[in-house]
UniProtKB/Swiss-Prot annotation:
Subunit structure: Homotetramer in membrane.
Record's protein name: Delta-latroinsectotoxin-Lh1a
Note: Iso and Leu residues are assigned by comparison with orthologs.
Tissue expression from the record: Expressed by the venom gland.
Organism (species): Latrodectus hasselti (Redback spider)
Function: Insecticidal presynaptic neurotoxin that induces massive neurotransmitter release at insect (but not vertebrate) neuromuscular junctions. Native toxin forms cation-permeable pores (with high permeability to calcium) in lipid membranes locust muscle membrane and artificial lipid bilayers. May bind to insect neurexin-1 homolog, insect adhesion G protein-coupled receptor L1 homolog, and insect receptor-type tyrosine-protein phosphatase S homolog, and induces neurotransmitter exocytosis both by forming tetrameric pores in membranes and signaling via G protein-coupled receptor.
Family indicated by similarity: Belongs to the cationic peptide 01 (latrotoxin) family. 04 (delta-latroinsectotoxin) subfamily.
GO biological process: exocytosis
Sequence ranges of the ANK repeats: 25-36, 37-45, 47-57, 58-62, 63-71
Domain notes: Two helices (H2 and H8) are predicted to insert into membranes and form pores by assembling into tetramers. The helices are contained within a helical bundle domain that undergoes significant conformational changes during pore formation to allow exposure of the transmembrane helices and transition of the toxin from a soluble monomer to a transmembrane tetramer.
GO CC terms in record: extracellular region; host cell presynaptic membrane; membrane; other organism cell membrane
Length: 71
């Protein structure tokens, strides 16, 4: 069962001591995506990255706001 290896959102949050870790994860994911796009030379993928990046930033702000309320 694949789900056994996956952590719940709560478990992942409990491992993050600071929101900056979330930012690091977003940056890392973005860097990996850009690297894949550059290797594949897929022009369309670059266009698709922009809305994805916007969504990631929006989620990051929401997570930071939630963490601020918890403190």
């Amino acid at each position: 069962d694949e789900e056994d290896g996956e952590m719940t959102l709560e478990e992942r949050f409990s491992e993050w001591s600071e929101p900056x870790t979330v930012q690091g994860a977003v940056d890392e994911a973005e860097a990996l995506l850009i690297e894949k796009i550059n290797h594949x030379x897929d022009v369309n993928a670059k266009d698709n990255l922009t809305p994805l990046h916007s969504a990631a930033k929006t989620a990051l702000h929401a997570i930071n706001d939630d963490l601020d309320m918890v403190r």
